[in-house]
Amino acid sequence: MTHSMIPAACMEKRCLKKRQPRFREKFPRLRKGGKNPPSVTQSPCLITFGLYSTRDCQEGSRLFTVNPLFRIMTKIAKSTFTTGTGTPGQFYSLPALAENGYPRLNRLPVSIRIVLESLLRNCDGLKVTEKDVDNLASWNANNPGSYEIPFTVARIVLQDLTGVPLLVDLAAMRSAVAGLGKDASVIEPLVPVDLVVDHSVQVDWAGCTDALEKNLDIEFQRNAERYEFLKWGQQAFQTFSVVPPSVGIVHQVNLEYLAQGVMEKDGVYFPDTLVGTDSHTTMINGIGVVGWGVGGIEAEAGMLGQPVTFLVPEVVGVHMTGELREGVTATDLALHVTQMLRSHGVVGKFVEFFGDGAAALPLADRATVANMAPEYGATMGFFPMDERCSDYLRQTGRSEEAITTYENYFKAQNLWGMPRNGDLDYTDQLELDLSAVEPAVSGPRRPQDHIRLNSIRDSFRKLVSMPVAEGGYGKKESPEVTVSMHSPAGVPVPVDGFSQEAKLKDGSILIAAITSCTNTSNPGLMLAAGLLAKKAVERGLNVPPHVKTSIAPGSRIASDYFATNSLQESLDALGFETVGYGCTTCI
């Protein structure tokens, strides 16, 4: 292209009227990924997308100027590292960006830098502009600012209740395209989409040895049409896959099987990032993957290659020191963190855990804490990548080549290893001594209502009689009065499925379920449940017949923990037979 091809108004730095539909016709070579025309350095402005940017003029028209990132984009985009196969892999280098005008970039929180890499890699002047990159690369811990970030994720994770409507939309779009006489296959998710069927199972049968098989049969009968539709979707779309029923809970399947750490497309490597249609998608933060739960519309936009936008967050750093005492579990830690962060206030913020205490936590415990991010109100509860992550990937069947690629990539990005105190800048920093965490439960209403285990009896009795306005139930504490919603006080309430009747009153326990995506794939927590059952059986304890008992592991591997350690017999003796692999009682 020569100067003669450029409008005189542009050469004179005058404003051009907005006629964007004609831009590509007039300058067909100037498009995303196009080559730099010879006249770029001499021209005061050129019209294009990606290599150049726009800014508004006072008259309301638009002046086009050279994208300042273009001068360093070639260097950033052509950075390489050694993959697990020994061959070079291309990546968008954050250290190279830091060397070109952003000297404090290496002090940004790890989670912010991973989002920044996505902006840098997807900067096209339209969906993501150089201003977006500049804003986030200049993130200030003391004053993050107020602007939106267009975050393009690497993949989408769905569960069946929210995922089916999205698949219906894709099918409808294909039907519309076919009706126009076009090729329906042009409708295809632009990023990989995984749907895990885990929300449809119900606990119709419990406390019997064949509960799993019976519940699974009923599940398929109830959902036959939905499951046939999902099977069609997996066959019809190249980038859409389905994890079938009775495999596990979506977040644990995501952690054990779907997470890759680093992804590759067209020879370019980039971090594994995602959004999911469930609030506890944050469990994946435990392995250093940026991701959180969104609504169906946002997830569908992400499927079609659109960025997920959110306001630039503050980042609260939690400096962990010490280690958990014997007998203190990951659940105790998660509840402690929930109470602490609820008190501090982290709604809409990123939380990033770091320090020697965080480095010592097993990855399963990190995932348990990260899973609770919706309960403590944060967008994410993020743990940076380190050797614990590599070990977990190895234990869950990833190849050594993939793990080496994973480690080398994040080392090349200066993102490898658990940060220590003072390494990074955070909006706020909290201190957490893990040795101070005590066994506890939460509730019975809110997750931040933290109750020490040795105080649970007195606390619950107090809550029963406490006024509703103060968080209680407003009931008279009278062990002599038997009440029921459907029978006069004092009349025994028959319990279906049992040969005997039970007298129920306020405070009676009716359901005892070992379940939830937070706990039921953590080896330590599941073994603790099995050992507790074993001790209860040894002491001659039993469960009252009116209590519905069940266990629903987060993945099938969790059942092996019990079988391998001879704990399943004790659980069965108390009525805790496996009823399914899914969300079950939590829904």
Language model features by range: what are they?
Residues T2-G34, S39:
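Basic, low-complexity intrinsically disordered segments
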Residues F23, F27, F49-Y52, F64, ...:
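Aromatic (phenylalanine/tyrosine) cluster motif
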